[in-house]
Amino acid sequence: KHLPPMQILAHLIAAESAHALRDRELRTNHFDAAIVLGQGPSSGELEETMEAAHLGAARWALSDREPQQALQWLDGIKQGAARRTLALRLRLKATRLNRQHTVALDTARLLKKHGAFSETAANSLIRELVMAHLNDAHDSAQLQTAWGQLEASEREAPEVVLHATQRLHKLGAPATEVMPWLTPLWNRMVQQPDSCAPAMRHRIVLELSRTLLMVPPDADWLASIDRARQTYPRWVELQFLAGMVCWHHALWGKAQQMLEMAAPQLMQAELQRQAWRTLALLAEHKEETARAQIYWKRAAEVVVA
């Protein structure tokens, strides 16, 4: 009764040893022998042993950088066993290696549900896969479809929204199409100030400043930014944003005032460089050549990583 499973295990152990020695031919010989023995009369013990064989084969295929082969072995496992943590981990590795980001994302969600990772590690992995999933979109319509496949909690993550807007820009979408994605992010940032860390605020402001300059001047946005600036006077990035939008509205004096206050205090290099560059352009507009040269020099001195 126990002989076939024991013989199969012996071959699997020998195959594992051959794999460790990088002897693919010997590994294949022992594995093939195990598969032949597994074709006998079915039993619960035999099924479990063959599941182990499939999992081992999937792991070896991944080691050989053959993700498609690994997925074929995993697909041969019964559904109950396929949902076990080890099988899901192997499927996650295989789908990531095979650049099947949507399937990898679904698998990572299952692993998170099963508690296979810490909360922090699971969220980081899922965020990475969400962004890869969005990167697979090659036009705005595909991006909207990919976005709709995300879970609500994933769509609410500021870094995911920002990644989606940046992807839209890369796909050549007009700025008017990008603004509806940024507006809720802005509203949450100013209505729930604890929802965004300073580094995230800097990224949101940078993306907003770029996008707002590509749409017609909007008085409502100007008023909203000015209210936020007055509500959070210590958020220097809002002075920068106000200055950039005032410049877009041809409010030269106020733009200069805001940017001159913000530029020396900004900690984010890209924001600071843009502030100095815009001040240089304002000085050139007023034909203040010497002042413009000073600002251009300061912009050049900012090192952007």
Which residue stretches match the model-derived regions?
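Membrane-proximal soluble helical/coiled-coil segments
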Residues: 1-78, 82-84
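Flexible helix-coil transition and linker loops at the boundaries of alpha-helical arrays
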Residues: 2-5, 38-48, 115-120, 148-155, ...
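Start-of-helix register in tetratricopeptide repeats
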Residues: 5, 9, 45-52, 86, ...
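Structural register within alpha-helical repeat arrays
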Residues: 7, 14, 57, 91, ...
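Residue at a conserved register position within TPR or TPR-like alpha-solenoid repeats
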Residues: 11, 18, 61, 95, ...
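Structural motif corresponding to the intra-repeat A-B loop/turn of tetratricopeptide repeats
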Residues: 21, 64, 98, 136-137, ...
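Alpha-helical repeat scaffolds
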Residues: 26-37, 66-78, 101-114, 138-153, ...
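Alpha-helical adaptor scaffolds
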Residues: 46, 50-63, 194-268
